[in-house]
UniProtKB/Swiss-Prot annotation:
Pfam families: COX15-CtaA. GO terms for biological process: heme A biosynthetic process. The chain crosses the membrane at residues 7-27, 92-112, 118-138, 159-179, 190-210, 253-273, 280-300, 302-322. One of its GO terms (molecular function) is metal ion binding. The keyword Metal-binding applies. Its cofactor is heme b. GO terms for cellular component: plasma membrane. This is Heme A synthase. The gene is ctaA.
Length: 341
């Protein structure tokens, strides 16, 4: 039995908006627009600057940032407006997504279209959404102090919260849409499939570290790095003393290594599980791998990089869908009507 049609559509819209938010966030980062707005004003920040005087005030605030001093000291007002508008759209769309998600919850709860367990789950998602907004500002603040870029650790945390939010929303949508656990498989194969999906999440977080360090701008060949599969600089004592995850070479190598590991581990899944979901997941993994290579050799072309980022979420969605279709030996079938009373 499926959940109320309106609830299913609403969750589908929220998932779609989250993916679009990922695209906008990626473009914001790739165009170096994220530090153009130097204040966090959740309410009054809805209104953009109006008139040249207001724009000049915003540009003066931007002039106090490390990014301006190191990278954009000669930026014109028109160019500043361009990067400001990109970040403004990023923040405004985040507010819109929050409203679209939060406002219908009381209505669905009062009209009994969702049960208490689903209400609690959705309120947890709303709380995570608030944390995501705060984490976004916490990330931006790291680029307003000393260095002209945000902390790659905070960027990874920002992305991880998005991954968590999207996964919960997508799983809820699948259950409300009537997706059921219909294919029985062994515990070993089920947990192997789950581990590959977990590796996908790890790889997405590693991608955020790569992006935060601008590591994609170096070693723009594949499969070799500086003429070798394993670059010699990985064996440098300086690297290990300075911090492995602070090093551009180490982080990019890890990202490459996990990408290959995911492909190798995902390849046998369709033959083990014998489901269309496993084939879809493998196809997404393969395409995402090719997008990653294309992004690297293009020296992070904006379109390819944005597609690579959002397709990571598409691959994750395919993985969650694959797992939702599986039932372990000895377990009872999980019905697809979570969310209704």
């Amino acid at each position: 039995m499926k959940a109320h049609f309106g609830v299913t559509v609403w969750l589908g819209v929220c998932c779609s908006m989250t993916l679009l938010m990922v695209v906008i966030g990626g473009i914001t980062r790739l165009t170096h627009s994220g530090l153009s707005i130097t204040e966090w004003q959740p309410i009054v920040g809805v209104v953009p600057p109006i008139g040249d005087e207001a724009w000049l005030r915003e540009k003066e605030k931007y002039a106090q940032t490390p990014e301006y001093r190191h990278r954009a000291a000669d930026i014109s007002l028109d160019d500043f407006k361009r990067i400001y508008i990109i970040e403004y759209i990023h923040r405004l769309f985040g507010r819109a997504l929050g409203a679209v998600f939060c406002l219908p919850i009381p209505y669905f709860a009062i009209t009994k279209r969702i049960n208490r367990a689903m209400v609690a789950k959705l309120l947890m998602v709303a709380l995570l959404g608030g944390m995501q907004g705060a984490m976004g500002w916490f990330m931006v603040k790291s680029g307003l102090v000393d260095t002209p870029r945000v902390s790659h650790y905070r960027l990874a945390g920002h992305l991880f919260l998005t991954i968590l939010l999207f996964s919960i929303l997508w799983h809820s949508f699948l259950r409300c849409a009537g997706v059921r656990s219909t294919t029985t498989t062994t515990n070993a194969r089920f947990f192997t499939a789950a581990a590959v999906v977990g590796l996908t999440v790890l790889q997405m977080v590693l991608g955020a570290l790569v992006a935060g360090l601008d590591a994609g701008l170096t070693y723009n060949t594949f499969p070799l790095m500086d003429g070798a599969i394993i670059p010699q600089s990985l064996f440098s004592a300086k690297l290990w003393h300075g911090g492995f995850l602070h090093d551009v070479t180490a982080v990019q190598f890890l990202h490459r290594l996990v990408a290959v590991l995911i492909v190798v581990c995902a390849a046998p899944l369709p033959f083990w599980l014998k489901t269309r979901g496993a084939w879809l997941f493998l196809a997404c993994v393969a395409l995402q791998f090719l997008l990653g290579v294309a992004t690297l050799v293009s020296v992070v072309h904006i379109f390819l990089a944005a597609m690579h980022q959002v397709f990571g979420f598409v691959t994750l969605a395919a993985g969650v869908h694959m797992l939702c279709r599986l039932r372990r030996e000895g377990s009872t079938c999980i019905s697809g009507h979570a969310g209704i009373s």
